[in-house]
Structure formats: C-alpha cells, structure tokens
UniProtKB/Swiss-Prot annotation:
<dbReference type="Pfam" id="PF10431">
    <property type="entry name" value="ClpB_D2-small"/>
</dbReference>
<dbReference type="GO" id="GO:0140662">
    <property type="term" value="F:ATP-dependent protein folding chaperone"/>
</dbReference>
<feature type="binding site">
    <location>
        <position position="33"/>
    </location>
    <ligand>
        <name>Zn(2+)</name>
    </ligand>
</feature>
<dbReference type="InterPro" id="IPR010603">
    <property type="entry name" value="Znf_CppX_C4"/>
</dbReference>
<dbReference type="InterPro" id="IPR019489">
    <property type="entry name" value="Clp_ATPase_C"/>
</dbReference>
<feature type="binding site">
    <location>
        <position position="14"/>
    </location>
    <ligand>
        <name>Zn(2+)</name>
    </ligand>
</feature>
<keyword id="KW-0547">Nucleotide-binding</keyword>
<dbReference type="Pfam" id="PF07724">
    <property type="entry name" value="AAA_2"/>
</dbReference>
<dbReference type="InterPro" id="IPR046425">
    <property type="entry name" value="ClpX_bact"/>
</dbReference>
<feature type="binding site">
    <location>
        <position position="36"/>
    </location>
    <ligand>
        <name>Zn(2+)</name>
    </ligand>
</feature>
<dbReference type="InterPro" id="IPR003959">
    <property type="entry name" value="ATPase_AAA_core"/>
</dbReference>
<comment type="subunit">
    <text>Component of the ClpX-ClpP complex. Forms a hexameric ring that, in the presence of ATP, binds to fourteen ClpP subunits assembled into a disk-like structure with a central cavity, resembling the structure of eukaryotic proteasomes.</text>
</comment>
<dbReference type="GO" id="GO:0008270">
    <property type="term" value="F:zinc ion binding"/>
</dbReference>
<protein>
    <recommendedName>
        <fullName>ATP-dependent Clp protease ATP-binding subunit ClpX</fullName>
    </recommendedName>
</protein>
<feature type="binding site">
    <location>
        <begin position="120"/>
        <end position="127"/>
    </location>
    <ligand>
        <name>ATP</name>
    </ligand>
</feature>
<dbReference type="InterPro" id="IPR038366">
    <property type="entry name" value="Znf_CppX_C4_sf"/>
</dbReference>
<dbReference type="GO" id="GO:0051301">
    <property type="term" value="P:cell division"/>
</dbReference>
C-alpha cells in the first residue's frame, strides 16, 4: 500500500505509480492509469461482442418453418382465406430465408418482398399478420395509416411506426430489425386523383412518399424511449431493410375500377363478348383480378405499389365461415367465453341455431369476423353481470331467441341438473 505522505501518485485500480505508466488520469479522490483504461475498454468490447453474437446466433439458429408448416399454423387460428394463406406463407418464408442467409447469394441481390393484403372489413387481414408474427416469435407492431402525416405536420410521423416496434422488444434494435409491421387502412392514404398533385396532400400522397424509403429499406434514427427528436440526443439506428412490412385495407370501390378494365360485356360489334346481366362477379372474385394499374387508378402512387410486390386478396366471409370462426379455431370466441364462465364453475353452451343467428347478425352489420365478439358480448353482458351474485348456477344455455333479443339466456341450477341427470337414468 503506497504511503500517504509519498508525493508520488498511484493508480487506484492496479496500484502502479505515475512513473510506471504513460498516463495517470485524475478523478475526484481517485486515479486511473492508461493501462487500466485499455483493459476496461477491452472488457467492454468483449461483452458487447458476446451480446451481439448471441443475438445473431439466436436469430440465425432458429429453425425457419417451411411454407407448409406456416400454412398449417395459420389454419389453427384463421378460418378460410386459403389463397391468401398460401401467398403469405411463401412470402414470409422467402423474407426470413433472405435474412438468414444474407441479402446477397452468389452475387445476386435478393430484394425484399413486402406484402399488400386486400379484403373486406373483418376478413382476417390483421389476424393473419399477428398469427404469423407469433408463429415466428418475432416482434410485431401495428399502425393505422389514417393517423400518419408527413414529417413536420400535425399528426403521427411515419418513423413512429418503428418506435412502436422498438417498444415491443425493449428498444433492442437487433430484435426489432427481424420484426413484422402491419399498417392497416392503407387504402385511406390514396391520393385524391390519378394525376400527381401540385399542392401538399400531407395525409394522402404525402404519407405514401414518406413511407417509401421506410418500407424499401433505410436506416431510421429513432429517439430512445420515445419523445421528439432534438439535435443533442443520441438515436437508435434501425435498418428497416430487414423488417417485413404488411399493408392492408378494405379498398372500398376498387372492384368498380377493376370491372371497368375487365368488363367487355358492354362491347358492340361481331367480336364483342355479351355478358348476362345476372353474371356479375362478387367483390371477392373481382378483387382476385387486381393489377397494379387498378391500384394506381384507385390512388396509390406507382412507386408505393412497387414496394409492395406481393399482393394477396381475401374473400368476404359467408355464414358457414363465420360459424366456423365462432367454434373451430384454437382461440375461438365461444371457447374463450366458455373458459371465462368455467372460472365461475359454470358451463356455457351455444346451441347451433344461436351460432347461425350470430353469423347472420354479423353479416347484416357488414362487420365480418370482427363484429362477432361484440355480438357475443352484448348477448352475455347481463348474465356475466349477475352470475357472480347468483348461487348454484351450473349451466348457461344460449339459443337463437337470445340472439334475437326475444328471450334471456337459460340458467340451469345444480339441483335441476342433478334431477335431469337422474331422470335420464
């Protein structure tokens, strides 16, 4: 231990004197030499390298499911939409294969294939994207295109989308770069006319322009832990070329644009094709014929469409599909409410005619699968309110009259249940 009366200065970490080292840096009551600084620097670099390699190996070593496996998993949670599932499975598989093996293979650069989902409200666009992210165990963030504006205008900056993704993975940029971002209501940012605008359209064409670089791939500078940007702060750098962007929208009116292009039924002359008035295709069938020029006419700019090369169309859900959605998926709505009632030791039964009535009600409201939960909630609200205060209820039965509002749910009490069971014997 150096003598306190000694005039020499010593490193507080290794104990070497100022004559034994090149530089001794003074702090409040402590000193550190250049050798200890170098040692600390090496230790920190090694730890950072270990963290990065662990993160990279976790991503690269993770088994990538095949398109068939992706499709099978989607089938467990999403009813119907077979074509969209197949398109999505292949596109997502190719995207993560590109990340796993590098964007360049044998000198050929592999471009990113972002996805555009076109389908009616409640057809399963958001659910497909969410289920895909859960299967692949990657961060997932969702944004509403209607809230976005160009930078510098009142509204949400497009880079806030990346911030949402960072928040989902505790601001780990490496994890975020392997995530999926779903932008909903993309059809609401179409420009007002087919011709380029000479005035600012900050929530339409302007947002499309702002999204271009982000979707194609750029290094976005994101403020840590949220907040607005200012010059004197450090930013988190996120490479968006590795992020998969899925855009979705109902595209109301797009069917008319497509029909104008493909319709030859109004032609005249010997070569014209005469089409029966009653042979009008459904909206879902028309959507399947969509081409880039239709989307341009609808209001998306050509550059934006070019960044979304994979297009999947979803069909409108019919009564049979809606009934299946209520009962078949692993997390079906009726199963969720049955589990909720089970926590009260009460069995919940939906009769077949009740399921059909709920499906018809959702179709009447034109809300698709999205409206089913609110219908079930409306039907069960009073029962869920009263049930914790009522004793000896063993079963609740819902039939079509309950859905129509003509009757209340049937409550079966435990004594009655026992009596019915004994009478069956």
């Amino acid at each position: 231990m150096p003598n306190k009366n000694d005039s020499l200065l010593y490193c507080s970490f290794c104990g070497k004197s100022q004559h034994e080292v090149k530089k001794l840096i003074a702090g409040p009551s402590v000193y550190i030499c250049n050798e200890c600084v170098d040692l600390c620097d090496d230790i920190i670099k090694e730890e950072i390298a270990e963290i990065n390699s662990a993160s990279e190996s976790t991503t690269s070593d993770k088994k990538l499911p095949t398109p068939h496996e992706i499709r099978d998993n989607l089938d467990d949670y999403v009813i119907g939409q077979d074509t969209a599932k197949k398109v999505l499975s292949v596109a997502v598989y190719n995207h993560y294969k590109r990340l796993k093996h590098g964007a360049i293979s044998d000198g050929v650069e592999l471009s990113k294939s972002n996805i555009l989902l076109i389908g009616p409200t409640g057809s399963g666009k958001t659910l497909l994207a969410e289920t895909m992210a859960r299967l692949l165990d990657v961060p997932f963030a969702m944004a509403d295109a209607t809230t976005l504006t160009e930078a510098g205008y009142v509204g949400e900056d497009v880079e806030n989308i990346i911030q949402k993704l960072l928040q989902k993975c505790d601001y780990d940029a490496e994890k975020a770069q392997h995530g999926i971002i779903y932008i909903d209501e993309i059809d609401k940012i179409t420009r007002k006319s087919e011709n380029p605008s000479i005035t600012r359209d900050v929530s339409g064409e302007g947002v499309q322009q702002a999204l271009l670089k982000l979707i194609e791939g750029t290094v976005a500078s994101i403020p840590p832990q949220g907040g607005r940007k200012h010059p004197n702060q450090e930013f988190i750098q996120v490479d968006t070329s590795k992020i998969l962007f899925i855009c979705g929208g109902a595209f109301s009116g797009l069917d008319s644009v497509i029909e104008q292009r493909v319709d030859t039924g109004t032609g005249i002359g010997f070569g014209a094709t005469v089409r029966d008035k009653d042979s009008k295709a459904t909206i879902s069938e028309t959507f399947q014929k969509v081409l880039p020029q239709d989307l341009i006419k609808y209001g998306l700019i050509p550059e934006f469409i070019g960044r979304l090369p994979v297009v999947a169309t979803l069909t409108e859900l019919d009564e049979h599909a809606l009934v299946e959605i209520l009962t078949a998926p692993k997390n079906a709505i009726t199963k969720q409410y049955a589990a909720l009632f089970g926590l009260e030791n009460v069995e919940l039964e939906f009769r077949e005619n009740a399921l059909i009535a709920m499906a018809q009600k959702a179709m009447g409201r034109k809300t698709g699968a999205r409206g089913l939960r609110s219908i079930v909630e409306e039907v069960l609200l009073d029962t869920m309110y009263d049930l914790p205060s009522v004793k000896n209820v063993s079963k609740v039965v819902i039939d079509e009259n309950v859905i129509a509002g003509k009757a209340k749910p049937l409550l079966i009490y435990s004594e009655e249940q026992e009596r019915l069971a004994s009478s069956d014997k």
